[in-house]
Curated annotation (Swiss-Prot):
One of its GO terms (biological process) is myelination. The modification N-acetylalanine is found at residue 1. Residues 1-171 are annotated as: Disordered. The lineage of its organism: Eukaryota, Metazoa, Chordata, Craniata, Vertebrata. Residues 1-12 have a biased composition (Basic residues). The gene is MBP. As in other animals, several charge isomers may be produced as a result of optional post-translational modifications, such as phosphorylation of serine or threonine residues, deamidation of glutamine or asparagine residues, citrullination and methylation of arginine residues. Phosphorylated by TAOK2, VRK2, MAPK11, MAPK12, MAPK14 and MINK1. The modification Phosphothreonine is found at residues 20, 35, 66, 95, 98. The modification Symmetric dimethylarginine is found at residue 107. GO terms for cellular component: cell periphery; compact myelin; internode region of axon; neuronal cell body; plasma membrane; protein-containing complex. This is Myelin basic protein.
């Protein structure tokens, strides 16, 4: 192991450019994502040892190469991985429109958590619509069902109609 480290340190400049080039080409393939993370760990491990042993110049170089290596790789890895949850997130929001509430019940609770976060970004929409709706829903005996029902209605009608409609229908 001690023999490998200096060679890796000397080659860190080439390692950085080679690994980022590889990831630019293969970053989107899931097979390479795992190996990329492995090489990233090895890469960081080698660089962690280098600044301690090496001179000040070497330390600077290692720090620079890690940044150069980590940023493009994180962008390459982050995009496909971030895209999927986002896509799933929107699919989860859209799906309650079509299936019956019985199917949405399981999702209803988790969806309500997500929708709070999503609608919290549009304060007028989310808080204006949610806060009045949720208080009467919790007062009722069917707390979870009410919350889920108002949720699906808000998504179906876009919030405005369900806000005026659901509390009156409940009462």
């Amino acid at each position: 192991a001690s023999q490998k480290r200096p060679s890796q340190r000397h080659g860190s400049k080439y390692l950085a450019s080679a690994s980022t080039m590889d990831h630019a080409r293969h970053g989107f393939l899931p097979r390479h994502r795992d190996t990329g993370i492995d090489s990233l760990g090895r890469f960081f491990g080698a660089d962690r040892g280098a600044p301690k042993r090496g001179s000040g110049k070497d330390g600077h170089h290692a720090a620079r190469t890690t940044h150069y290596g980590s940023l493009p790789q994180k962008a390459q890895h982050g995009r496909p991985q971030d895209e999927n949850p986002v896509v799933h997130f929107f699919k989860n929001i859209v799906t309650p429109r079509t299936p019956p509430p019985s199917q949405g019940k399981g999702r209803g609770l988790s969806l309500s958590r997500f929708s709070w976060g999503a609608e919290g970004q549009k304060p007028g929409f989310g808080y204006g619509g949610r806060a009045p709706d949720y208080k009467p829903a919790h007062k009722g005996l069917k707390g979870a069902q009410d919350a889920q029902g108002t949720l699906s209605k808000i998504f179906k009608l876009g919030g405005r109609d369900s806000r005026s409609g659901s509390p009156m229908a409940r009462r």
